Amino acid sequence: MMRTWMVYVVGLVGELYGSQVEETREMREMKEALERLFSRRLSDSEIEMVESLENGGNFETRVLVPVIFHKDKVVVSPAARYRDIEKEERVYVEEVIRRLRSLVWHSMVYIYVPKNNDWIMDLICKVSGMSSPQRLDDVALYKDTGGNCGMKFVDLVNKMFKQNADMLKKFGDLLSNGAETRILELPDSLSEDERRREVEMLQRVKEYGKMLCTEDKQKEIVEAQKIMCDACEQIWRREEDRKEFTMEIYSRYLNMKVMRGGVERDVEDPLIDHMDHYMLISTHKKYKCMDVVAELVRKVFVEDKDIEDSDVMSAVCSVRERKRLEEMREMEERKRKEEERAKNEEELLRMVEREEREKREESKGRGKKKRGNRGAGESKEESKGRGKRKRGNKGAGESKEEDRGEEGGVEAEDPLEEMAVGEAWRKKKGSGEKRISEEHHYKVHSRVLRWKKDAGEIKRELDEGYEKKWKNRSIEEIKEQKKVHDIVEVMKLLRDKEKCDRFFVRTGKYMKGKSERWKMVANGILEEGGEKKVGKVEVGLFKGEGGESVVYHLMFRPTETERTGRVGGSSFGKYDDVDEIKKEKSSDMFGFRYPSGVRCEMTSNRNEFRIEYRNRKNTSEVLRTLTILRIPET
């Protein structure tokens, strides 16, 4: 949802360059300011978005993401209580909470209205300052256990929304009256067309103000945030969902940091995200299932898009499929336990039978010994008796050996619990070997290896190839694409299971072009010529005919291309823009060496994997740097 992002950026431009811009040159000034901010020219889609905002404003509804981030980790999760926060992070968290009520208020009422933003922002601050809740000690409220375990962070957020709702009517009245006054005060010097546009915009502001005065709108804002908090709490319970969610939060913080020129803020406020209140509430009412709402929130947040009907149905289908698989696993687990119980009972019966047989054999052996001692008077008979006893003892010995052999045979079979564990271990080991094979050994498709070549050769191959979207590209375009696609060194990170799991999140599998596909995604920063771009490192994989995992897509996707929906859309989406994958030659990359001269240098630690690409002719010159960042701690 590029619109969400651009609303923030346009607001940030006002913060960095001053909110008062000469209205006759406002559009050009805004574009120039944004280009200075991005250190590049705006794309056509970005210019279109800025023009749309400048012409139509932004009245979209918003929600607050109930998570506090500090540096590269989550320090307060949705369900966190004050006692759960690490002691060294509490001072930072308390400072965030002191600013939280103001942020909540802005998320409830902020709108972007070109040429009118100054007086609206002044009004937002004025009403917020007039409110009595502003003087409450929110830190003490969060700390207070009240004889129990204390409130969760989502409870604190919801409480602030409810308290701030009392100010909505006052703000709505002032906003509506202010818009009406400005309609009456429009200068006569405006052309008919300019006057019409100004009246239309101010009329929208007036209607918005009146809407805020209604009880229905006030309830909607509070209810939507409550649903958002519950959804985030639900997301946090599933590890894979939590990882994706926090990676997207981290990505947005990185973008803000880069746009500020790397200037660190003392405190980073929780994120505000544009989300359709009506769709959120109606989905919750219709399905009465927080799993569905949580899946919907996760999907639209990590894919950074507006809620559409198709997203709701996708969330419903995902939850149903997940529950079906969980039920299957539960059924298999019950079946396994039943089989284990039956084997235990069988083993117990065998043990009882063995003990009874041993007792009978022992009793029989004692009886033979007594009968052998009765004829001990005569030497001949004694001699015969001794012979008989010897033979009898020999028989007894054989019987005991047989018993020991039988018993030894049973002992050779592990006790049932050990057998079950052993069998499970063997199965686990087998599946583990398969998993290691998938995660450690990849083949790389020729469409990925192509980007190692020079731009001219790449262009020739693409023009002669089967992928229509790559045909007839200019050399300049190919060179730009090479910067984000020629990153095959990432394979070194992928082969190390421990590191790979620390940096990359795996997305769900999907079918396309008769092949099963999935992605691995990590946050990254690409630096070149003093410019930094935040984005995602994407790895696209499919299952080869021999069951091996083949990397068919590898690139760094800058945030601006992801948010404008270009080049395949969101990194986390279950789709890609590769329609067909030809059965071309793949390589496992073992033994690969670049031509003479240093091409790149790789360094890593627990938090980042860094690749520096150097000029082969002058190895001291760094051409570009790709830094892959660890999944944030949660």
UniProtKB/Swiss-Prot annotation:
UniProt biased composition (Basic and acidic residues): 354-365, 397-407
Compositional bias ranges of the Acidic residues kind: 408-417
Disulphide-bridged cysteine pairs: none
InterPro entries, alphabetized: DUF3654 (IPR022115), UPF0329 (IPR011667)
Start and end residues of each stretch annotated as Disordered: 354-438
Family according to the record: Belongs to the UPF0329 family.
Protein name: UPF0329 protein ECU11_2090
Organism: Encephalitozoon cuniculi (strain GB-M1) (Microsporidian parasite)
